[in-house]
Amino acid sequence: MNIIDEGQPFTVIVDYAHAPDALEKVFDSIGAHKGRIISVHGGAGRRDPSTRPIRGAILAKYSDLVIITEDDSRDEDPEKIAEGFIKGAEKAGMKLGKDLIKELDREKAIKLAIESAKPGDLVLLLGKGHEKTILRADGPHDFEDIKVAKKYIRQYHQ
């Protein structure tokens, strides 16, 4: 778990959590939070699709805003991956376009989370953690949640 502090009036945490139990542990470790919780998460391609709705439901249970995005889609359709998360989050009570957003471009998803954050909020960037690449159908691409988050914090909250 990495806390990003660029002097912004809200908290940003980057964590590798990508399995249901790991997500639960992240939310348990946070405890009660006074501001909103904004979670950015996606699922890897060629991994167990049955966990996607479960993870969507976990995100919905603990978050005020969930942004579903890409995460190492490999050769699997990112839209298809996102569908599983959305189904779980909707079943748990979230509404697409209201408190549940699909933004498959991970950088844009992080930007949206940072732009949306207000003083006292908590932004969770989940699933990639320390990784320095994102795996797409055409191969690996340089990508770091921490660098992207810092870029948009500096742009919108300095």
Name each region found by the language model:
Residues 2-158:
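ATP-dependent carboxylate-amine ligase
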